[in-house]
A protein has these predicted regions:
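Transmembrane beta-strands of outer-membrane beta-barrel pores
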Residues: 1-5, 70-74, 104, 118-124, ...
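Outer-membrane beta-barrel biogenesis signature
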Residues: 1-18, 111
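Transmembrane beta-barrel domains of bacterial outer-membrane proteins
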Residues: 1-9, 47-59, 75, 99, ...
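Extracellular/periplasm-exposed beta-strand and loop segments of Gram-negative cell-envelope proteins
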Residues: 10-16, 21-43, 73-93, 123-152, ...
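Transmembrane beta-barrel architecture of outer-membrane proteins
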Residues: 45-49, 91-97, 111-113, 152-156, ...
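Residues on the lipid-exposed face of transmembrane beta-strands in outer-membrane beta-barrel proteins
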Residues: 50-56, 66-70, 96-102, 116-120, ...
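Repeated loop/turn-to-beta-strand initiation elements of outer-membrane beta-barrel proteins
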Residues: 61-64, 108-110, 167-171
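Predominantly the C-terminal beta-signal and adjacent terminal strand-loop region
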Residues: 148-154, 162-208
């Protein structure tokens, strides 16, 4: 789509843009970019999750765990050049995870392991922040709350290292990869653009 097409759409369906100031700003941005294609550039920040989990040893090397997980996803996109439309999306998720792990090497202080499992996530809050910039000057900004109803399922695998605080409590870090199944929502996150991607997980294991 070209900016001229978008301008025609704005003029034909102004009711699709209830924020009058945002609508006027988009008209100016479309005018300044006339003749150019509407190319959107998006940067996705690395997702980081924090987890509290309960782990049960089922043999000398194997264990199973269940955890409560918090994840923050954010991205920034822009359309246009000197006059542009900038959008920042921030989403907060709470999830439940189940994992199976195998200890690869253990000392009194550290444990090294491989783990895999699945997670179900639910978005609990989100915001979309928008800046409307005309000739390098921001003329308007807006913020709206996002509501994402569907649950999202994923499977993941990682290598982990745990610092053993005491025999029952350990702090861990897990760099790994995850695959996210589509949830039917219309949000734009790294999970939708790249269903298979690397992530980083931090947390605490309670072992019993």
């Amino acid at each position: 789509m070209y900016w001229s097409d978008f301008k025609d759409y704005l003029q034909e369906y102004p009711s699709d843009f209830p924020d009058a100031q945002a609508y006027e700003a988009l008209l100016q941005i479309a005018n300044d970019n006339t003749g150019r294609p509407m190319t959107e550039y998006t940067h996705y920040n690395l997702p980081v999750s924090i987890e509290l989990s309960l782990r049960k040893s089922i043999s000398r090397h194997w264990g199973v765990s269940a955890g409560l997980q918090y994840t923050y996803l954010s991205s920034e996109s822009s359309i246009g050049e000197d006059s542009k439309w900038v959008k920042r999306q921030k989403l907060h998720y709470i999830g439940l995870s189940v994992k199976l792990d195998r200890r690869l090497y253990t000392t009194r202080t550290f444990s090294f392991y491989a783990t895999g499992g699945g997670t179900i996530d639910k978005s609990v809050s989100g915001k979309l922040e928008q800046d409307f910039i005309v000739q390098k000057e921001r003329i308007y900004s807006s913020t709206e709350n996002l509501k994402i109803k569907p649950f999202q399922f994923s499977i993941h695998a990682a290598l982990g290292i745990q610092y053993n605080i005491n025999p029952t409590l350990g702090a861990f870090i897990e760099p790994g990869a995850a695959f996210y199944f589509k949830d039917g929502s219309f949000k734009n996150t790294i999970r939708d653009k790249h269903p298979l991607h690397f992530n980083l997980q931090l947390g605490v294991h309670w072992n019993y």
